């Protein structure tokens, strides 16, 4: 059996374009999501947290077929029904659809906290870390200190600029805050 290529951002780009064209609602999650934010790691697959609905599942199937994935009927049914975890190894690279990631309460909440990194909708690093911690898998637990360090640096670089009380009041139209 030949070894699968490791994750490359180009694969995420392919998925992002296909998913946008098909109208799929999703976030990149897991280590591949962190890599898209600049994390210096490697992984073997693209991890995707899709919104769980029959319609979204059908759009996922159409999008993956469009970029060369062979989706047989049993696999299609798992995707359309939103099975908690679906591994897809029948395409140009490996994809994990995680409809119910450990440690994350709901897709709408995660999406509201998510980040837009160029064309990539990515789960917030805190959600990625919470999911890895909740999974309890040894390989995820080993990665946690590195992900936490990366998160701290990422949040420092992407923090909104500090504003004075006067600036905040002025933005609200309250001029008596001096």
Q: Model features per residue range: what roles?
A:
Residues 1-178:
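Compositionally biased terminal segments of proteins
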């Amino acid at each position: 059996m030949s070894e699968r290529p490791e994750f490359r951002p180009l694969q995420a780009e392919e998925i992002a374009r296909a998913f946008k064209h098909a109208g799929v609602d999703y976030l990149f999650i897991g280590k591949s999501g962190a890599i898209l934010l600049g994390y210096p790691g490697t992984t073997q697959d693209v991890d995707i947290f899709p919104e769980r609905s029959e319609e979204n599942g059908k759009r996922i199937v159409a999008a993956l077929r469009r970029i060369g994935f062979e989706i047989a009927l049993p696999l299609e049914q798992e995707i359309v029904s939103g099975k908690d975890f679906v591994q897809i190894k029948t395409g140009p690279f490996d994809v994990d659809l995680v409809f119910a990631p450990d440690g994350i309460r709901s897709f709408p909440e995660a999406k509201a906290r998510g980040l837009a990194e160029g064309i990539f909708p990515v789960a917030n690093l805190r959600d990625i870390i919470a999911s890895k911690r909740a999974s309890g898998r040894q390989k995820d637990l080993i990665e946690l200190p590195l992900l936490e360090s990366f998160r701290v640096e990422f949040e420092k670089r992407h923090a909104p600029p500090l504003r004075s009380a006067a600036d905040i009041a002025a933005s609200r139209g309250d001029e008596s805050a001096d």
